[in-house]
Amino acid sequence: ILTRHASDRDLARGGFVNSRAAAALARRVAAAFDVRKSRPDPEARALSGGKLQKFVIGRELDRAPRLLIVNQPTWGVDAGAAAVIRQALIALAADGAAVLMISQDLDEIFAVADRVAVIARGRLAPARPVADISRRDIGLLMAGLPAQAAS
């Protein structure tokens, strides 16, 4: 919590951490994203990979950023947690934030994205509306074929 929120005046002032505010933030994020803990205030290293992933995503979304760049947001989490994370990303975008999601999970891409761009061989294909692109199109673009061949 602390490194991400070091500039938050409610959490840190003059180099000192407000431990009560930090603990309250951690509890709020854990509750919102159903991060179950074996003890009340565990260190991050005590959380499983999936629990840590949910917590990190929750921590970032808690600040309601205007821009969020997220890589593999549902990696390592169960299906229920993945649905919660995806819905939170959709809600953030619906509130006007720009969300750039990098994912290898096509189901996730089709569930969350408005537009899809594919990187192949170091080149970025033009972004296309998700409604105008198929899994086959994405596969062809991933193979490095020209965009018109994927249409």
List each language-model region with its residue ranges:
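Glycine-rich phosphate-binding loops of nucleotide-dependent enzymes
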Residues: 1-151
